[in-house]
Amino acid sequence: MRYDDITEAIGNTPLVRIDPAVHGLRTIDLYAKLEMLNPFGSVKDRAAWNMLRPDLAGAVERDAQVVELSSGNTAKALAVLAGLHGLRFRSVTNRMRVPELRELLLLLGAEIEELPGRSECLDPTDTDDPLTQFHRALTEDGAHHLHTDQYFNPRNTEAHTTGTGPEIVKDLGGRAPDWFVACVGTAGSSTGVARVLREHDPGVGVLGLVAAKSDFIPGIRTLDEVAEVGLFDPETYDVIEAVTADEAIDGMVELNRRCGLLAGPTSGAAYRGAVSHLRPLDEERARRASGEPAERATAVFIACDRVESYLGYVRRRRPELLGRAPHRNALATVTEAELAAVRDAGVAEARRWIEEERPLVVDLRGSHAYAALHIEGAINIVDELFEQQVHGGLPFGRDRPVLLVCPVGEKSARFAALLTRMGHTNVRSLAGGVVAWRDAGAPLVRE
């Protein structure tokens, strides 16, 4: 197939049936929409081009810089598209958590600006959040930049109402699937596809998948974060369920090894979430058939992007998959029972403890967030580096008082549970994190 421009290769991705011998569903045909085969490697290629294209001529004329609040696939696609048209691109984020994507953005000539922030995406109601302030500044003055605004731009959703959704219907012979499954990041793809499918059949079931609380799966928000996304509408989904990072990796490995799909952990989360949700429905359908062949139903999930960019993510969480010894003292092994037993300290209690016993206060946030505001006397060890230290054993004396601090108290509680299991006798987590400390009017200092 011949193209005159690489952007012509965006879209029209294959819809591939997953072998039932792999997923085990007896009455439901499960299909993967291979968005990973877009030319820049992900489902975000569609939205990036649809958001950029209408304003491209004006941006070129005034030599504007393309700017997006993204640390992942949207930034990657926009960096390529901007470069194609002689424009500069700047990625603004609170934290680059996938080093391979950071390096690729730099290779593509992108400028990366990291700001302190409490979430992977901005909260327009939080006027103190630097990402929110930056977003507002971009919105108010567009003379020298083109802000594609993926979290609020309706063209994000439109890319899927005009492309992805109709392609699924066409490839299924003109009918919508019985179920559609998508991970929720900006909510653009899930909203756009669901809208089209329900126009064909209002009875289509839509499953939205989010990351489990305090977990990190690239490209997926937690339930708390997703409410901050302007395109997110809970009415789009019949049900929203959580997927863990371990489940995402397990699903990814199954797609890689059993299905020949070199998809990443986001795709693994969509696959594993789809199978888990559909299994009881499949069993009920088989039971009702009473031994007769059941009428086939269909389900589609989005295979978002490729695996190659996430080998570091796998190495940190499941090193045994890459031929390395499993990490001792891994954060992912903390149980709910251990978490429930953690000694939390509210703001008032923590202030008294600091005054009376002078515990070591360890701030687990990124360096930019720490520099912006932190508890006086706290040291900064970014959570990923802290976990690497813990892999080798207790980083402090067993009896030394330690107060762990993170944005909202979730990650610090998991670390406190892990250190307690390892034998530390006096570690606590700041309940509610820095946000609770700030909201209580407790003092914070700047670097």
Task: Describe every region a protein language model picked out.
Residues R400, P407-V408:
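Mid-chain, well-packed structural core segment of small domains
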Residues G432-A436:
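Histidine-bearing beta->alpha loop at or near hydrolase active sites
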Residues P395:
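Short, polar/acidic, helix-capping and beta-turn segments at strand->helix junctions
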Residues A442-V445:
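Short, Lys/Arg-rich amphipathic alpha-helical interaction segments
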Residues M1-R352, L360, G366-G392, L403, ...:
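PLP-dependent amino-acid enzyme catalytic core
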Residues R414:
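Active-site-adjacent pocket-lining segments in enzyme domains
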